Amino acid sequence: MHVFIVYAHPEPKSFNGAMKDLAISELTSLGHQVKVSDLYAMNFRAVASRDDFQMPQDKDFLKYASEQGHASKTKSFSQDIQAEQEKLLWADFVIFQFPLWWYSVPAILKGWFDRVFASGFVYGKEIGRYDTGGLKGRKAMLSTTTGSPEHAYTPYGMDGDIHEKILYHINHGILYFSGMEPVEPFVAWTPSRDEKDRDRYLKEFQERLRQLSEIPSIPYHPSSHYREDHQLKDEYR
């Protein structure tokens, strides 16, 4: 299997770094081919701009999604965007390794999504979205760490349900929207507080990596389950 790891943490010796390193070594030992984008080490530019396009169609007014569509057709994205898109097309499975900051991904990873998951590449009129999106046929897993304990992320917890509120906008709004099939996320709860917990999480993560092809997918509705007004059909409610 081709596995692409997108890693977003500024400290190489962090627990996130340990998880990334474990993923590389474990997956390689299992015979998978692995590519990594270490966004901080790459100094990946998170800010969308005109510089993302080598052959802009409108030099006077930047309509970003339109320029993305044009660049997708003309293969004229900046080299850093093209390189990341090529890794996505190469991959069968993508792992996103990051700390949960402000109930979401670090800004550098959000910028990566903004620039790389482009109109005309992962979604658009000619491509579709959700189950027909440009990255269909690929699976993706969020692997994240938190600063609050697990019970804070339950349906009645102070921080909100980790699946339905915290990670939904990433799993459904980004990954599934692009055509990918998100699987159940791996969450390490407050790993900074206890060394025994860190060791346990690494062992659990190692076991998860060994069963990569067997991780259950999140059961989102396909586009065909919705009406033209984007509401779920009665029979699927």
Residues covered by each model-derived region:
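N-terminal beta1-alpha1-beta2 submodule of the flavodoxin-like/Rossmannoid cofactor-binding fold
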Residues: 1-98, 103-122, 195, 200-237
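Hydrophobic anchor at the start of a short beta-strand
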Residues: 34, 182-183
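Beta-strand-loop-alpha "switch" segments that mediate conformational coupling across diverse proteins
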Residues: 185-187
